[in-house]
């Protein structure tokens, strides 16, 4: 750059700093690029698929899927992990359907959980914004976007047609929220539902669409599609769901990774089941017929017995998890991801 341009740039930068404050514009090389802070999801498989070890703080995350697919379970497990690490969590229950007994079973400290059950969508998003701006909450979950009913709709008649009202509400709220989320380093998770598009579809195009317009798709740094793909049985009794989670969008690591995990009724995501499946894949756990072995020790005949063994011997499970993290999770992934994101 020639001297005249340098002087002009220097004058412009000093004018900007004078008008808008120090640090309002800076060279990327002047600050240290730090690793992205994350909150673990409670699923080792998903943490690894996300490429950064969990859900990123200071970002918007969307989790969507059909009914009873495990959306709320996944967010409650993330809340439990956040609380275990000393963080503060808030749950904005627009659906008015949170079960505190189930949340406690998943490891959530219900006494410390901040809960709001707002009357309108505007109230829900205003509460979320105030919690984010406080800078003292680590994770805010909004359950769900579909239940964020605009005030005009609540005050109107049952059959009133108010097209695009919810989409406008979400678009306005996200414009306001994103800057505050980044500044306070809060993770905001929106749970969303699926609807079917009515009308003629193009071949190969999905008829499914998420509620609340397109704004959330753009503002979200991570989007997760979660679906039930089968049942887990113990004899004739169904004890849980086999669940597929796909990383549909990821601004911090390569997207489109997918994992198949198990959600057990009353327990949530089966940590021990994941350790066994990943251990077999990584050849750390040996599977001979129905028997599973880890090291020199047989840990059970059949997956259910192996799962019980790991639950009863937490030191073995912890050792296996440490080996799997070392094998699957590159140590420098978060730093590179943060670096790439900031260069965009």
From Swiss-Prot:
Residues 323-337 have a biased composition (Basic and acidic residues). GO terms for cellular component: cytosol. CDD domains: RecA (cd00983). This is Protein RecA. Can catalyze the hydrolysis of ATP in the presence of single-stranded DNA, the ATP-dependent uptake of single-stranded DNA by duplex DNA, and the ATP-dependent hybridization of homologous single-stranded DNAs. It interacts with LexA causing its activation and leading to its autocatalytic cleavage. Keywords: ATP-binding, Cytoplasm, DNA damage, DNA recombination, DNA repair, DNA-binding, Nucleotide-binding, SOS response. The gene is recA. Belongs to the RecA family. It comes from Xanthomonas euvesicatoria pv. vesicatoria (strain 85-10).
